[in-house]
């Protein structure tokens, strides 16, 4: 295949890290990330090296027969989850195959070992006790957003008010924080322009006590002296500690 070529094919399997092995109707093999076995997808080839082609996913033409699970409203747009549309058992099978493949490639016949199955998580949803959300915008120069990066994008942010891998306290804090800073007109940090204040919102919840720590990561630029403590009051969360962490780091890799 040639660079820039657009084609379609069926995902045969997924190798680590989330590299879908896609075969066209002509039998050509292409790597397309963020795909699920059984999907029919269209893609644009962006790299060809030593006879191996890699491509960018354009569209899921047909869902996989495995995709029967309920998803949050952000799935497919948000880059946080890849396999949420699959039943948990099928998610484990894919991950187990990936680990097994890496073990076989690394060890081969060098020594004998016993490959044990993945141990099930007691929670399928709302299992995260720590999340770091990013401030940004959903599109260039759009309104303030707070959440996860869009799938395949380094810049755009999806506000994940319906995120299912965290519990309701995380979502409440996220939306209260976004509302607060949106009303105050406080900007996120633009790495290319070197302007703005807000970087990340880190939330950690203790499993046994239910206590919550909220850390607002910001730049060291001047800020409007609005009392940040109001944010956790809006969220109406008990046992919540809030503090800010100014970070002097700069980067020129963003818009």
Annotate each language-model stretch with its function.
Residues 1-249:
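Accessory RNA-recognition modules of RNA-modification enzymes
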């Amino acid at each position: 295949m040639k660079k820039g070529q657009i084609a379609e094919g069926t995902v045969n399997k997924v190798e680590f890290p989330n590299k879908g092995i896609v075969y066209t109707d002509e039998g050509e093999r292409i790597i397309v990330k963020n795909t699920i076995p059984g999907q029919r997808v269209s893609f644009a080839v962006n790299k060809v090296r030593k006879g191996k082609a890699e491509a960018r996913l354009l569209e899921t033409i047909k869902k996989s027969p495995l995709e029967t699970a309920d998803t949050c409203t952000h799935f497919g747009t948000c880059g946080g989850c890849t396999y949420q549309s699959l039943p948990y058992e099928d998610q484990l099978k894919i991950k187990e195959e990936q680990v097994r493949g890496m073990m076989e490639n690394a060890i081969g016949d060098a020594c004998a070992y016993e490959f044990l199955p993945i141990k099930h998580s007691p929670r399928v949803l709302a299992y995260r006790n720590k999340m770091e959300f990013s401030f940004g915008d959903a599109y260039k120069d759009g309104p303030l957003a707070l959440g996860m990066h869009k799938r395949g994008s380094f810049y755009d942010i999806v506000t994940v008010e319906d995120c299912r891998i965290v519990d309701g306290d995380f979502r409440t804090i996220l939306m209260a924080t976004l509302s607060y800073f949106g009303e105050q007109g406080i900007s996120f940090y633009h790495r290319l322009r070197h302007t703005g204040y807000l970087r990340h919102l880190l939330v950690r919840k203790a499993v046994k006590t239910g206590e919550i720590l909220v850390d607002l990561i910001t730049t060291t630029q001047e800020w409007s002296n609005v009392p940040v403590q109001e944010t956790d009051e809006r969220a109406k969360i008990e046992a919540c500690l809030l503090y800010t962490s100014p970070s002097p780091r700069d980067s020129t890799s963003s818009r």
